Amino acid sequence: MIIRSDENIALQPEIDRRRTFAIISHPDAGKTTLTEKFLLYGGAIQMAGQVRAKGEARRTRSDFMQMEKDRGISVSASAMSFEYDNYWFNLVDTPGHSDFSEDTYRTLTAVDAAVMVIDGAKGVESQTQKLFEVCRMRDMPILTFCNKMDRESRDTFDIIDEIQENLAIDVTPASWPIGVGREFMGCYDMLNDRLELMDRADRNVVAKSIKISGLDDPKLAELVPENLLEKFLEEIEMAQELMPKFDHQSFMDGTMTPIWFG
């Protein structure tokens, strides 16, 4: 029998607003760089570092050991915290290399959810699949981020199909890329009906976040080149018709993952 004291009751609102999640991926998919972006946009840091920083360039916060700095990889799990939208997030950056995977396996027993990072050019890689299976054993909710869309990447539908087939999980798009490779100019936020357009001079920065009124909004034609817009609208129409809608319970059960691109 659990007796709830007045102190426990007083702490409950603070407990309810806390979220702990890990970031998992195959080596070099961009996991630690994404960690820096979470910290940056969460207000925990003022400038994002680089995994392979040279000279006086700022390095990433999670790769703080000398070995990590020298090799440009994560060799141990690192926990960081930030507050965003009245929630307190505990973020754990985990090692991707199989040599250090035991630390990752232990970490995954202590988190609420995981963000799975996929390289847009390589798709589902071996270590990603192993870490996914660890999450699956715990029926853990998984969010997917397909990274490096500004490089030569595979077809968006092919990436989604591979995730569904290799990992046996339903995938529902939460965003959709506008162009790929050199033509990549940002994403359409399908959940909030917004265009997230990148700065052409610095692809790491969102230059514009524009609210639109559906896919027939005239602003689309003003902001997106005609050749990209036509293909984008065709893909969005297919995605909405063919792919499952987001179901919160399926996500919480670990049988469906929403996917973002960037």
Could you describe each region identified by the protein language model?
Residues 1-29, 120-262:
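P-loop NTPase catalytic nucleotide-binding module
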Residues 2-118, 124, 173, 215-217:
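P-loop NTPase switch module centered on the Walker A-proximal segment
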